Amino acid sequence: MKIVKLQDIIGTEREVHGEGWRSRRILLKKDKMGFSLHETIWPPGHELRMWYKNHLEAVYCVAGNGSIEDLETGEVHELYDGVCYALDKHDRHILRGGTEEMRLVCVFNPPVTGLEVHDEDGAYCLVEDDDD
């Protein structure tokens, strides 16, 4: 059994800062769960175009508000506490912060190693680590 406390992640290499957002990597590939689990903090008004072409992602909003735009259909979906979205088709999208900071619980498959950064498409490359 693994027990991970958020307080033990903050300020370590498992707390990753990106373009305006920060992500706490709770479970990673080396934890051998078959997925990775993150808490992502998204600031009000911030937006980022992404396309996880190498990963599937499910995101559950537990606080704040914002929206996600499906770039294939143009549909915009409001996000707030209790809403989940799943990028089950490697969907190109724009995530936008609303009027309050969003707190998002994210699951990636395949799991990330924690070393990934968004590329020019807004995707994570598949990263191999030494813990396989």
UniProtKB/Swiss-Prot annotation:
**Record GO biological process:** ectoine biosynthetic process
The record's listing under HAMAP family reads:
Ectoine_synth
Transmembrane feature ranges: none
The EC category is lyase
Q: Which organism is it from?
A: Alkalilimnicola ehrlichii (strain ATCC BAA-1101 / DSM 17681 / MLHE-1)
Q: What is this protein called?
A: L-ectoine synthase
Q: Which of UniProt's keywords are assigned here?
A: Lyase
Q: Supply the InterPro entries for this chain.
A: Ectoine_synth, RmlC-like_jellyroll, RmlC_Cupin_sf
Question: Which pathway or pathways does this protein act in?
Answer: Amine and polyamine biosynthesis; ectoine biosynthesis; L-ectoine from L-aspartate 4-semialdehyde: step 3/3
The family annotation for this protein states: Belongs to the ectoine synthase family.
Stored Gene3D superfamilies: Jelly Rolls
Reactions performed catalytically? (2S)-4-acetamido-2-aminobutanoate = L-ectoine + H2O
Which PANTHER family does the entry mention? L-ECTOINE SYNTHASE, PTHR39289
Domain of life (superkingdom): Bacteria
* The protein's Enzyme Commission number: 4.2.1.108
Q: What does this protein do?
A: Catalyzes the circularization of gamma-N-acetyl-alpha,gamma-diaminobutyric acid (ADABA) to ectoine (1,4,5,6-tetrahydro-2-methyl-4-pyrimidine carboxylic acid), which is an excellent osmoprotectant.
Q: Does the keyword Lyase apply?
A: yes
Q: Which GO terms describe its molecular function?
A: ectoine synthase activity
